[in-house]
Amino acid sequence: MSEYLIIGTGPAGISAAEAIRKLDPGGRITLVTEEKEGYYSRPGLAYLLTGEIPQEQLYPFSRDDFQRLQLKLVFARAVQILPAQHQVVLHDGGRIGYDRVLIATGAQAIPAMLPGAQYSGVIKMDTLAEARQII
């Protein structure tokens, strides 16, 4: 049985997990994310802020979907890949083994380098937690 490790739970990570499950129904698939909310639509955050959608609609892939596809979700930050050992080191010192690993961490906004950007109340919005600071 193959062990698949996907770092990141954005669209690329979720799509990869779905594709792997189709190709290898018995494989073990683990997704690692530091995003406490799991997978949600980051583009949808703008619509959440404007009130066009409720928070529940940010989740196109539910916890039931994770269970249905037998995906293990680990809430941690991957800090190092050890290719020779086929392991990923987590921020807490834990390790996860793999046969195949995919890095699908996506993009992050770069804070603006404008006068006043360092003040409290100026928030870059990459995550649901940051959107909540604005709401």
Q: What residue spans do the PLM features occupy?
A:
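FAD-binding core/adjacent interface of flavoenzyme oxidoreductases
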Residues: 1-5, 64-135
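Beta1-alpha1 glycine-rich phosphate/pyrophosphate-binding loop at the start
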Residues: 2-72
